[in-house]
A protein has these predicted regions:
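M16 family metallopeptidases and their MPP-like homologs
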Residues: 1-6, 31-83, 88-138, 156-163
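Generic solvent-exposed, charged/amphipathic alpha-helical segments
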Residues: 18-19, 75, 145, 149
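Proteolytic maturation boundary segments
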Residues: 139-167
């Protein structure tokens, strides 16, 4: 994983779209690592912004004997994100999915109240929810590349592997 952003950081929107684009069954991670190479049971990305900067991480469920290969592939994918950012197709799909999920969540009064309350608590303001869709829509391919370069640094990552105990 990598150091991430805070809730107030404007980079949050581009980084959330990178996370979304790397996390579903049509994502570059899933297609390459699981489907093409057969190295994983599941894979994706997590982006956890917080009051203080959080983290961005890739995760994979794999067999113990495939850990090194998976790690190499994840590093290659991070390098591709730094080099090119998301493709237009990936970015558009991520925007549609993320904005759609947020619109559905806003239909539930409890979820809406919780989001507005948390936005106020985090110092974003209760009206933040009304501006989010526009902020996601404004993210460009160049911005996804810029945030990947800024946050997915090869020399500033932490690798954590959890597996069975060795006898």
């Amino acid at each position: 994983g990598f150091a991430g952003v805070s809730m107030k950081d404007a980079d949050r929107y581009a980084l959330e779209l990178v996370q979304e684009a790397c996390s579903d069954l049509g994502s570059r991670l899933f297609l390459r690592i699981r489907e093409e190479l057969g190295l994983a049971y599941y894979c994706g990305a997590q982006n956890f912004p917080g009051v203080a900067p959080g983290y961005f991480a890739f995760y994979v469920g794999t067999a113990p004997d495939k850990v090194k290969l998976v790690e190499e592939e994840l590093l290659k994918e991070a390098a591709l994100l730094r080099e090119k950012g998301l493709s237009a197709e990936e970015l558009n799909r991520a925007k549609a999915k993320l904005i759609g999920q947020k619109k559905i969540a806003r239909q539930d009064l409890g979820g809406l109240a919780q989001t507005v309350a948390l936005d106020e608590l985090y110092g974003l303001g209760y009206e933040n929810i009304d501006a989010e869709d526009t902020k996601y829509e404004a993210v460009t391919i160049a911005e996804t590349k810029r945030v990947a370069l800024k946050y997915l640094k090869a020399d500033a990552l932490v690798v954590s592997v959890i597996g069975p105990e060795k006898a």
